[in-house]
From Swiss-Prot:
Higher expression in the liver. Also found in heart, brain, kidney, pancreas, prostate, testis and ovary. It is found in: Mitochondrion. This is Kynurenine/alpha-aminoadipate aminotransferase, mitochondrial. Kynurenine transaminase activity is competitively inhibited by aminoadipate, asparagine, glutamate, histidine, cysteine, lysine, 3-hydroxy-kynurenine and phenylalanine. GO terms for molecular function: 2-aminoadipate transaminase activity; glycine:2-oxoglutarate aminotransferase activity; kynurenine-glyoxylate transaminase activity; kynurenine-oxoglutarate transaminase activity; methionine-glyoxylate transaminase activity; protein homodimerization activity; pyridoxal phosphate binding. The keyword Mitochondrion applies. Optimum pH is 7-9. Transaminase with broad substrate specificity. Has transaminase activity towards aminoadipate, kynurenine, methionine and glutamate. Shows activity also towards tryptophan, aspartate and hydroxykynurenine. Accepts a variety of oxo-acids as amino-group acceptors, with a preference for 2-oxoglutarate, 2-oxocaproic acid, phenylpyruvate and alpha-oxo-gamma-methiol butyric acid. Can also use glyoxylate as amino-group acceptor (in vitro). Homodimer. It catalyses: glycine + 2-oxoglutarate = glyoxylate + L-glutamate; L-kynurenine + 2-oxoglutarate = kynurenate + L-glutamate + H2O; L-kynurenine + glyoxylate = kynurenate + glycine + H2O; 3-hydroxy-L-kynurenine + glyoxylate = xanthurenate + glycine + H2O. The keyword Mitochondrion applies. The modification N6-(pyridoxal phosphate)lysine is found at K263.
Length: 425
């Protein structure tokens, strides 16, 4: 892989921060090391001294005085070593990337912790995209991604999708505008990457099948583009047999995968992680060095202690409990939809995630109905146009989340929605 063509001039110009490098050395060095290098505040001056956090089953995470000093201090930009090590083993266990033992320059699997997967994705986009570059994604798409891409001045090319995710024939048809060898010629402007949420796509709830992933990956190899696998709902697949990931089939080192703890442990702790080829992950880490410096040390230690306490088996048991909860929530919103929206709208059963994507019949644009009329009735949902490149275009779709509302609240919300639809027809 020629990674240089996926790195902008600004990203290529980034050099390691000497101060951040010293922080990395200190974090891995013996406690006897005397440091006069970094501007680390004296931890004895921090007002917080200890903490005890109670978790499931009455177990506790302890922050004694020494641990608290570390938790409140600067830490390596890539993440604290014990969390990185645990996550690397998790990725090997779940995905077994072919690139684990590749030479670093040839795309060896690397990993870094980010302040939520959104931060990682933004830095990946900024690393790759020059104004005018072509990028591929499937609409409707996560609005946060669209808002990240628009200011970068890229051309977003929509790839058709259905209930099984991206349609490979649509991708193949788009790529036929170029010849495979055009990827070696910057003037041809071949697509830099394909972005997709493969499981429980936000907002549709669609999931890519294994067969389609294989077809898509082969097209990526043929036309030499990256795949950005944004997978925050990987652990919320209602069928607990998890579909193989792009990372698991990445023989070239062309997949950048974004994972998140937001949906299964905590959204407020803002801990996610990127996995991908070392030459690209290194560029992201260099960007972190001069922006946020590093993810929260305290939050990383809290999650790391929990994961080490659980072990992989305990972690997966927790994931199963989370899946069972959201599966019941999904059943509740589907029951409410069947009860109130039959004949007024159409939808399909989400394969993963926490959203129901609804198409209202007979109404070309539901924006006013959702943003004004429903709000006045005390019901909040999102109009579908927020998930398209052209957000000003009319859309008959809306997104309803089933993550937090009770079954009774979902029932009331859809009763209100049904009433408003009938009044608008």
């Amino acid at each position: 892989m020629n990674y240089a063509r996926f790195i902008t001039a600004a990203s290529a110009a980034r050099n390691p921060s000497p101060i951040r490098t010293m922080t990395d050395i200190l974090s891995r060095g013996p406690k006897s090391m005397i440091s006069l290098a970094g501007g680390l505040p004296n931890p004895n001056m921090f007002p917080f001294k200890t903490a005890v956090i109670t978790v499931e089953n009455g177990k506790t995470i302890q922050f004694g005085e020494e641990m608290m000093k570390r938790a409140l201090q600067y830490s390596p930009s890539a993440g604290i070593p014990e969390l990185l090590s645990w996550l690397k083993q998790l990725q090997i266990k779940l995905h077994n990337p072919p690139t684990i033992h590749y030479p670093p320059s040839q795309g060896q699997m690397d990993l870094c912790v980010t302040s939520g997967s959104q931060q990682g994705l933004c830095k990946v986009f900024e690393m790759i995209i020059n104004p005018g570059d072509n990028v591929l994604l499937d609409e409707p798409a996560y609005s946060g991604t669209l808002q990240s891409l628009h200011p970068l001045g890229c051309n977003i090319i929509n790839v058709a999708s259905d209930e099984s995710g991206i349609v490979p024939d649509s991708l193949r048809d788009i790529l036929s505008r170029w010849k495979p060898e055009d990827a070696k010629n910057p003037q041809k402007n071949t697509p830099k990457f394909l972005y997709t949420v493969p499981n429980g796509n936000n907002p549709t709830g669609n999931s890519l099948t294994s067969e389609r992933k294989k077809e898509i990956y082969e097209l990526a190899r043929k036309y030499d583009f990256l795949i950005i696998e944004d997978d925050p709902y990987y652990f919320l697949q209602f069928n607990k047999f998890r579909v193989p990931t792009f990372l698991s089939m990445d023989v070239d080192g062309r997949v950048i995968r974004a994972d998140s703890f937001s949906k299964i442990i905590s959204s407020g702790l803002r801990i996610g992680f990127l996995t991908g080829p070392k030459p690209l992950i290194e560029r992201v880490i260099l960007h972190i060095q001069v922006s946020t410096l590093h993810p929260s040390t305290f939050n990383q230690l809290m999650i790391s202690q929990l994961l080490h306490e659980w072990g992989e088996e305990g972690f997966m048991a927790h994931v199963d409990r989370v899946i069972d909860f959201y599966s019941n929530q999904k059943d509740a919103i589907l029951a409410a939809a069947d009860k109130w929206l039959t004949g007024l709208a159409e939808w399909h059963v989400p394969a993963a995630g926490m959203f129901l994507w609804i198409k209202v019949k007979g109404i070309n644009d539901v924006k006013e109905l959702i943003e004004e009329k429903a709000v006045k009735m005390g019901v909040l949902m999102l109009p579908g146009n927020a998930f398209y490149v052209d957000s000003s275009a009319p859309s008959p779709y809306l997104r309803a989340s089933f993550s937090s509302a009770s079954p009774e609240q979902m029932d009331v919300a859809f009763q209100v929605l049904a009433q408003l639809i009938k009044e608008s027809l």
